[in-house]
Amino acid sequence: MTSSDQPERGSGDAAVQAAAERAEQTRGRNVPQFDDLPGVGDTANLRLGPELNQACLALLPLVGVWRGDGEAKHPSLEESYWFRQQVSFAHDGRPFLFYESRAWRLDREGGEVVAPDFREVGWLRPQPDDTIEFLLVHSGGLSEMFFGKPRNQTTWEFGTDAVVRTPSAEDATAASRLYGVVEGALAYVEERATSEHELQPRLSAKLDRVVG
């Protein structure tokens, strides 16, 4: 092994220090709570609220709120563009996670917000055989039913079993998603197929933890 192949001296310590600094900023934050609602509220912070259900342990690294930028690029789009996104994975102690995503279109990479963009809500439902059902509804008129499994402790892969469209929805026939937590950040790639195009990348983003 050459010297260029070896890790930079102290790089491990720097990574640990960076993780500790992130935790100091995010450990006390949570999703908004309404005190006048009955029962247990949602939490995206494993330090606060109800304990994570045992069925959801394979999804534990996802729990939190994540923000960052990504790129939309696909033949079905008029043009590629950059977006800012917030993704939340929360729970209320029951055997599923609640998922919510909001995005805003940017004028350029790393630029300013110019318009609201896509929104998604859904639920991840782990099953006894390690399969994860991912039910996802889009503001653009799509409903998708994904099935997936963990690749390892910090990576999850999903593919659609069914796609339902309203009459006014965008063209879509299938999709896949790959999520991974890498060095404290959440990265994902979505592939999309349409009636005219085979499955290929459409969305990708890298998001930093802001809650949890």
Swiss-Prot record:
Motif stretch (GXWXGXG): 64-70
InterPro entries: Calycin, Nb(III)_bact/plant, Nitrobindin, THAP4-like_heme-bd
Region described as Disordered: 1-36
Gene3D superfamilies named in the record: 2.40.128.20
Basic and acidic residues bias spans: 1-11
Coiled coil: none
Protein family membership: Belongs to the nitrobindin family.
PANTHER family recorded: PEROXYNITRITE ISOMERASE THAP4 (PTHR15854:SF4), THAP4 PROTEIN (PTHR15854)
Protein's name according to its UniProt entry: Ferric nitrobindin-like protein
Organism taxonomic ancestry: Bacteria, Bacillati, Actinomycetota, Actinomycetes, Pseudonocardiales
